[in-house]
Amino acid sequence: SRRPLPARVPAGENPLAIAGPSCAFSSMDEPTKTARKPAWLRARLPGGPGYVATRKLVEDNRLHTVCQSAQCPNLGECWSRGTATLMILGNICTRSCNFCAIATGRPTELDLGEPARVAEAVATMNLRHCVITSVARDELADGGASVWAATIRAIRHRNPGTAIEVLTPDFKGNLAHVDVVLDARPDIYNHNLETVERLQKPVRVQARYDRSRSVLRHAKSRGFATKTGIMLGVGEEPAEVERTLRDIAADRTDILTIGQYLQPSPKHLPVSRWATPEEFTHWKQLGLALGIGVVESGPLVRSSYHADEQSARYAGEGRGNASVLATA
């Protein structure tokens, strides 16, 4: 059963009593003085037979990955392990979020063969846990929900033992479109808040904090395991991060990821600061104390980073009712 949100922890107080001089976020309000990344942000460079095989698989099946389109720093590690987060509905987004490297513009026509190719790629990679995401397709009547459903069903048919995690857009808050995705029965429903409420407009101008929360609450109300993620380094304050974690816990979200924002190009939102590994540990401990089941928090953490391990920990706590999760 879910750990209840501790009533004994008043808002604004740290339930772990770890705040103080040793854990003070002294750089929280200070802008980044140098473009040089700290040592803890060094990621594995692409290379090796696993990386080559994954790249060939993606290219041969004419697939898109968020690893490439979003310039994920973990691409080298994940592809070397033979895993990739596949991105459906093309690689051009109808939104223009200021943190995201994915191209914005007029999307191409729908590729009706994409669901089958995605399912085959999951089989070829022999994934026990796959993560599927997409661009936003606001120009479509259903926001792409029907393609989402077709993809989930194709993966399930071809790979009945694979846990399916979906990372979806907000479908402009249309819960009927969210239901189309949920009716296809993914194992984990992920939708990212991305940042604190105050910074929604400068970070992702076409989204809303309350709308994203409503999507997550709706999925939870239907009995699905839910997941969300936020970034540090876009101008947030410590109290705002705490408030966001409290909101996530109040929405009974099961899994939370917290990572460092990295500026994709000079045209994107600048990095306000480099959060330290100690700060990521602080927020992980706070999230767990508030009752969030699984918290993955670290400078290089992204939504799909070690997602299989997150779902295994979730299943290990006896949460959820999807037997597939136990094999992830």
Where on the chain are the PLM-derived regions?
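A secondary-structure boundary/capping signal
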Residues: Q68, I88-L89, T133, L167, ...
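Short, surface-exposed acidic/glycine-rich loop or hinge patches that mediate macromolecular interfaces
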Residues: N91, P169-K172, G235, L300
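Canonical Radical SAM [4Fe-4S] cluster-binding loop centered on the CxxxCxxC motif
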Residues: P31-L41, E77-E114
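Glycine/Thr-rich phosphate-binding loops of Rossmann-like dinucleotide-binding domains
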Residues: S96, L140, L199, P266, ...
